[in-house]
Regions:
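Charged, terminal alpha-helix-loop-beta segments
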Residues: 1-152
């Protein structure tokens, strides 16, 4: 009976650890990619909120948030800060500054790797704000099967 079982060749899934191999520049490559409708829809699925792009590099005083969006059915503002590196204190401050500057109801921080202390800070913010404000910390991973195109 074992002789009748066909052996199937399977590919290997691998993770691309250096996201800069895919998006060399965070602002001009990753943010531009994420702001495209099909990719913003992927983010919408991940957070459970329908997002519509308002603007990339939206001003907040002397600074600018990577993506300013809105929730489709409520018009609530959403700020999206990208960091294709491990989390750091600087970007945590940016997320809060941009959310305040745009009176956003949701703040989404997309990172390569979330350090435990920053994940706890986001959890603390969610625990100590009311239900009208929410913070998301998402890790982006890029995978490949053998020689296939990379997929987020």
């Amino acid at each position: 009976m074992l002789k009748n079982i066909m052996t199937k060749k399977l590919g290997r899934i691998g993770e691309i650890k250096n996201l800069r191999e895919i998006w060399a520049n965070e602002a001009s490559d990753f943010t531009k990619w994420l702001a495209e409708e099909e990719n913003l829809n992927l983010l919408s699925e991940a957070v459970g909120v329908d997002l519509e792009l308002i603007k990339t590099e939206a001003d907040v005083g002397r600074y600018s948030v990577d993506i300013l969006a809105k929730e489709s059915n409520t018009e609530r503002k959403v700020v999206i800060e990208n960091q294709i590196e491990p989390t750091n204190h600087d970007h945590l401050g940016k997320v809060i500054t941009y959310a305040a500057g745009h009176d956003a109801s949701l703040a989404i921080w997309i990172v390569r790797d979330a350090k435990e202390e920053h994940a706890k800070a986001i959890e603390w913010l969610n625990d100590h704000t009311d239900d009208s404000i929410g913070f998301f910390l998402l890790e982006i991973k890029v995978l490949k099967i053998d020689d296939s195109l990379p997929a987020p």
